[in-house]
Amino acid sequence: MRTLSLLTLLALTAFCLSDLAGAKPSDSESDKAFMSKQEGSKVVNRLRRYLNNGLGAPAPYPDPLEPHREVCELNPNCDELADHIGFQDAYKRIYGTTV
């Protein structure tokens, strides 16, 4: 009985090992996971086109309210009010002009 189970185990082992040897992917299938250097450089150059002079990120637009915001930050009353109701409403209440 032991020899029969040992032979069966050896046969299963040989069968499994032969399947693993034949299970390697062919060259055409494994090449699909990678791209050529030319295709890769096209992708990188396409992405660089959207960056600002190679600095890493597009340049932000200047905020037109920044000078008013700095004036409001220098006034403690306006700064405190801006924390509660927002910058534009606080600036309008303190200085009386619309932003």
UniProtKB/Swiss-Prot annotation:
This is Osteocalcin. Residues 1-23 form the signal peptide. The modification Hydroxyproline is found at residue 58. It is found in: Secreted. Ca(2+) 1 binds at residue 66. PROSITE patterns: GLA_1, GLA_2. Residues 50-96 form the Gla domain. Disulfide bonds join 72-78. Residues 24-49 form a propeptide. One of its GO terms (biological process) is ossification. Ca(2+) 3 binds at residues 73, 79. Keywords: Biomineralization, Calcium, Cleavage on pair of basic residues, Disulfide bond, Gamma-carboxyglutamic acid, Hormone, Hydroxylation, Metal-binding, Secreted, Signal. GO terms for molecular function: calcium ion binding; calcium-dependent protein binding; hormone activity; hydroxyapatite binding; structural constituent of bone; transition metal ion binding. The carboxylated form is one of the main organic components of the bone matrix, which constitutes 1-2% of the total bone protein: it acts as a negative regulator of bone formation and is required to limit bone formation without impairing bone resorption or mineralization. The carboxylated form binds strongly to apatite and calcium.
